[in-house]
Protein backbone atom coordinates (compact mmCIF):
# COMPACT_ATOMS: atom_id res chain seq x y z
CA UNK A 1 0.00 0.00 0.00
CA UNK A 2 1.40 3.41 -0.91
CA UNK A 3 1.26 6.52 1.24
CA UNK A 4 -1.47 7.97 -0.97
CA UNK A 5 -3.84 5.03 -0.56
CA UNK A 6 -6.47 5.50 2.09
CA UNK A 7 -6.73 2.82 4.74
CA UNK A 8 -10.18 1.81 5.90
CA UNK A 9 -10.79 2.83 9.49
CA UNK A 10 -10.70 -0.04 11.94
CA UNK A 11 -13.14 -0.44 14.76
CA UNK A 12 -11.70 -1.43 18.09
CA UNK A 13 -14.06 -3.93 19.69
CA UNK A 14 -15.94 -4.12 21.94
CA UNK A 15 -17.96 -0.94 21.33
CA UNK A 16 -20.43 -0.38 24.15
CA UNK A 17 -22.67 2.14 22.37
CA UNK A 18 -22.54 1.19 18.67
CA UNK A 19 -25.31 2.92 16.65
CA UNK A 20 -27.31 1.03 14.03
CA UNK A 21 -29.90 2.64 11.77
CA UNK A 22 -32.39 0.37 9.99
CA UNK A 23 -34.49 1.75 7.12
CA UNK A 24 -37.48 -0.41 6.24
CA UNK A 25 -40.95 -0.39 4.74
CA UNK A 26 -43.55 0.72 7.26
CA UNK A 27 -45.69 -2.12 8.57
CA UNK A 28 -47.33 -3.57 11.66
CA UNK A 29 -44.94 -5.57 13.83
CA UNK A 30 -41.83 -4.73 11.83
CA UNK A 31 -40.14 -2.80 14.64
CA UNK A 32 -40.65 -5.78 16.96
CA UNK A 33 -39.20 -8.17 14.37
CA UNK A 34 -36.18 -5.91 13.77
CA UNK A 35 -35.50 -5.72 17.51
CA UNK A 36 -35.96 -9.49 17.86
CA UNK A 37 -33.40 -10.13 15.11
CA UNK A 38 -30.86 -7.73 16.60
CA UNK A 39 -31.38 -9.17 20.11
CA UNK A 40 -30.37 -12.61 18.81
CA UNK A 41 -26.91 -11.20 18.14
CA UNK A 42 -26.39 -8.33 20.59
CA UNK A 43 -27.48 -6.54 23.73
CA UNK A 44 -29.65 -3.52 22.86
CA UNK A 45 -29.73 -0.38 24.96
CA UNK A 46 -33.55 -0.14 25.24
CA UNK A 47 -33.25 3.47 26.44
CA UNK A 48 -31.79 4.43 23.04
CA UNK A 49 -34.28 2.99 20.55
CA UNK A 50 -35.87 5.62 18.32
CA UNK A 51 -38.45 5.16 15.57
CA UNK A 52 -39.31 7.73 12.89
CA UNK A 53 -41.57 7.62 9.85
CA UNK A 54 -40.78 9.23 6.51
CA UNK A 55 -42.85 12.25 5.45
CA UNK A 56 -44.97 10.00 3.21
CA UNK A 57 -45.28 7.25 5.82
CA UNK A 58 -43.94 4.66 3.39
CA UNK A 59 -40.66 4.08 5.24
CA UNK A 60 -39.66 3.80 8.88
CA UNK A 61 -36.23 4.39 10.38
CA UNK A 62 -35.30 2.64 13.59
CA UNK A 63 -32.13 3.78 15.30
CA UNK A 64 -30.75 1.69 18.13
CA UNK A 65 -27.54 1.20 20.05
CA UNK A 66 -25.91 -2.15 20.79
CA UNK A 67 -22.84 -3.62 22.40
CA UNK A 68 -20.79 -4.58 19.33
CA UNK A 69 -18.32 -7.38 19.98
CA UNK A 70 -16.78 -8.04 16.55
CA UNK A 71 -17.12 -7.58 12.79
CA UNK A 72 -18.81 -10.97 12.34
CA UNK A 73 -21.58 -9.94 14.72
CA UNK A 74 -22.26 -6.78 12.70
CA UNK A 75 -22.22 -8.76 9.45
CA UNK A 76 -24.70 -11.30 10.83
CA UNK A 77 -27.08 -8.58 12.04
CA UNK A 78 -26.92 -6.87 8.65
CA UNK A 79 -27.43 -10.11 6.72
CA UNK A 80 -30.38 -11.29 8.77
CA UNK A 81 -32.11 -7.91 8.67
CA UNK A 82 -31.66 -7.63 4.89
CA UNK A 83 -33.03 -11.17 4.44
CA UNK A 84 -36.43 -10.05 5.78
CA UNK A 85 -37.25 -8.47 2.43
CA UNK A 86 -38.66 -5.29 4.00
CA UNK A 87 -35.37 -3.82 5.25
CA UNK A 88 -33.77 -1.60 2.61
CA UNK A 89 -30.65 -0.38 4.42
CA UNK A 90 -28.69 -1.03 7.57
CA UNK A 91 -26.24 1.72 8.47
UniProtKB/Swiss-Prot annotation:
It comes from the Bacteria. One of its GO terms (cellular component) is cytosol. SUPFAM superfamilies: YbeD/HP0495-like. Coiled coil: none annotated. Belongs to the UPF0250 family. NCBIfam families: PRK00341.1. This is UPF0250 protein PFLU_5418. It comes from Pseudomonas fluorescens (strain SBW25).
